Each structure stands twice: as structure tokens, then as C-alpha cells.
From Swiss-Prot:
Species of provenance: Homo sapiens
Record's compositionally biased regions (Basic and acidic residues): 93-109, 118-136
Protein name according to UniProt: Short stature homeobox protein 2
InterPro entries documented for this protein: HD, Homeobox_CS, Homeodomain-like_sf, HTH_motif, OAR_dom, Paired_homeobox_Bicoid
Statement: the UniProt record of this protein carries the keyword DNA-binding: yes
Length: 331
């Protein structure tokens, strides 16, 4: 009987103690997330203190004591220990901290460890751009081909035959001369360009030579403009001693053309003297222009002297004819 009374009192005291420890452990669990949110660095220490707190040890010991005692008090101890263990396993401060960190990492404004900073991206792009520029600057230099005299003679001979050889002719010529087909093709391209340049220069030279035949006639519109504007007027002051047969023929032809244009288009009559002769070509040396101007001045002086001589001779002829006529009439 005394043993039963002692056992009941002991189990009652143990039950009251377990209730107090359970209340204390519940308060610790509820205050854990708040402390973790305010003090992130101290959460792990709080979790360690909670794990090593007497409430946790009491919950484990209560479970063991309830299982060993068996009875009403023991059952209560087991239930308290199980509840304490379940609460501790479901709402651990460490797990709450981990969940809070995971939720904060999902927020759009929070920096992530996996994201690359923009500065690092810019540095990588700059480094890549510098590498690309270095590769473009370092280019392979073209090797210049030096043709022998025999190769040049063969190429020129084929170029005289045709300016555009086909692939078979280029291949045969490259095998015969020991050159690559690409070299032969490039040589023909350069040779055609050179030929076109020579033809253009020759054409320009022909035009300049044809224009130089009438260098002395370029001053005619400015010397005797009235004669060119009125080609069919036979006044004595409009007659100019011809410098040469070619100049006279050219002036007559231009006068006829100007007269025809005057009837067709009256507004072109004023511009006729300036449209008859081509303009002097550009790009001539200064020495050539000076020589041309000197020759033109000498031609003008000779024309003026010839005109004066012709006037004097015509006056003398008229006087001689007048004397003869007077003698014939008996005056």
C-alpha cells in the first residue's frame, strides 16, 4: 500500500513537471521564427540552444519513463513526449529560417547567387570584342607573283587571241607555265583593266589632237563677233583675211549652222559664237596653255597686219581705176 501511494505521488509529480516543461518548450518554438527574422545570424545558435534545452531532454526522458512505468502516469508521459517530439520535428527554427530564405530568394528584387552581374558581362563582352579585333587585324599578307619573261610572252600571246579565256584555256595555260589557275585569271583581269585604260587615254588623245587643229580659231568669236552673227552681210568691215583654207571653211560651216539655228530657234542666235568651237580641254600643263595663248596672239597680230595691207592695196586699186576711168572719159 505504501509502495502504491509512493508510486502514484511520484508519477503525479513527474506529470506536473512534464506539463511545465512542455509549456516552456512551446513558448520557445513560438518565439523562434521571430528571433530568426530579426537576428538572422543568431538563428543557428538559438536552434542549438533549443536542441540542448532541458525541455527537449525532458520530452525524450518523459517518453522513456512513460514507456517503462506503464499506467496512467506513464501513458501521459509518453503522450507528452510524443507531442513534444512532433512539435519539435514540425516547427524547427532552422527549418523556418531555411524556408524564409528560400521565399526571399524567390522575390524578384532580391539578388541571386546564380545570376551574373552586369559588370562581369560587360567585361566578358569587351574581352571578346578585343579578341575579334586582334584576329581581324592579323591578316595573311598576299604573296606577290613575279612572272618570268617566258610566262609574260605566253600570257600576252593568249591575250592577243582573246581577252576572255575560258576555264579550259586557263587550266591548260597554268599547267604549261607552272602557275595556278587563280594567278592566270587575276593576270587577265589586270591586263583587261590596263587595256581599257590605254584605250581611254588614246581616245582622249585623239580628241585633244582634233581640237588642237583649231586652236587659232578659238579667238575668232571674240575678234569678229558681228561677222559670225550676220554671215550673209557683205560689208567691208566684216571681212577678215583668212588665216588658212581650213579656218575659212570651218568659219563658213559654222556660220551656216548658226544661221539655220537662228531661223529654227531665235533664242540660240546670241549663243551661236560660243557654241561653234569646243571649250579648251582641262588638265593641260601651264606651259602648253601659255604657248597656245602666245600663238593665238601672234595670229591675231598677223591678221591685223594683213587686214591693214589689204585695205591699203584696195584703196590704191580704187584710185588707179578712177584715174583710168577719168582718162577714158577724157577728163
Amino acid at each position: 500500500m505504501e509502495e502504491l501511494t509512493a508510486f502514484v505521488s511520484k508519477s503525479f509529480d513527474q506529470k506536473v513537471k512534464e506539463k511545465k516543461e512542455a509549456i516552456t518548450y512551446r513558448e520557445v518554438l513560438e518565439s523562434g521564427p521571430l528571433r530568426g527574422a530579426k537576428e538572422p545570424t543568431g538563428c543557428t545558435e538559438a536552434g542549438r540552444d533549443d536542441r540542448s534545452s532541458p525541455a527537449v531532454r525532458a520530452a525524450g526522458g518523459g517518453g522513456g519513463g512513460g514507456g517503462g512505468g506503464g499506467g496512467g502516469g506513464g501513458g501521459g508521459g509518453v503522450g507528452g513526449g510524443g507531442a513534444g517530439g512532433g512539435a519539435g520535428g514540425g516547427r524547427s527554427p532552422v527549418r523556418e529560417l531555411d524556408m524564409g530564405a528560400a521565399e526571399r530568394s524567390r522575390e524578384p528584387g532580391s539578388p541571386r547567387l546564380t545570376e551574373v552581374s552586369p559588370e562581369l558581362k560587360d567585361r566578358k563582352e569587351d574581352a571578346k570584342g578585343m579578341e575579334d579585333e586582334g584576329q581581324t587585324k592579323i591578316k595573311q599578307r598576299r604573296s606577290r607573283t613575279n612572272f618570268t619573261l617566258e610566262q609574260l610572252n605566253e600570257l600576252e600571246r593568249l591575250f592577243d587571241e582573246t581577252h576572255y579565256p575560258d576555264a579550259f584555256m586557263r587550266e591548260e595555260l597554268s599547267q604549261r607555265l607552272g602557275l595556278s589557275e587563280a594567278r592566270v585569271q587575276v593576270w587577265f583581269q589586270n591586263r583587261r583593266a590596263k587595256c581599257r585604260k590605254q584605250e581611254n587615254q588614246l581616245h582622249k588623245g585623239v580628241l585633244i589632237g582634233a581640237a588642237s587643229q583649231f586652236e587659232a580659231c578659238r579667238v575668232a568669236p571674240y575678234v569678229n563677233v558681228g561677222a559670225l552673227r550676220m554671215p550673209f552681210q557683205q560689208d567691208s568691215h566684216c571681212n577678215v583675211t583668212p588665216l588658212s583654207f581650213q579656218v575659212q571653211a570651218q568659219l563658213q560651216l559654222d556660220s551656216a549652222v548658226a544661221h539655220a539655228h537662228h531661223h529654227l530657234h531665235p533664242h540660240l542666235a546670241a549663243h551661236a559664237p560660243y557654241m561653234m568651237f569646243p571649250a579648251p580641254p582641262f588638265g593641260l600643263p601651264l606651259a602648253t596653255l601659255a604657248a597656245d595663248s602666245a600663238s593665238a596672239a601672234s595670229v591675231v597680230a598677223a591678221a591685223a597686219a594683213a587686214k591693214t595691207t589689204s585695205k591699203n592695196s584696195s584703196i590704191a586699186d580704187l584710185r588707179l581705176k578712177a584715174k583710168k576711168h577719168a582718162a577714158a572719159l577724157g577728163l
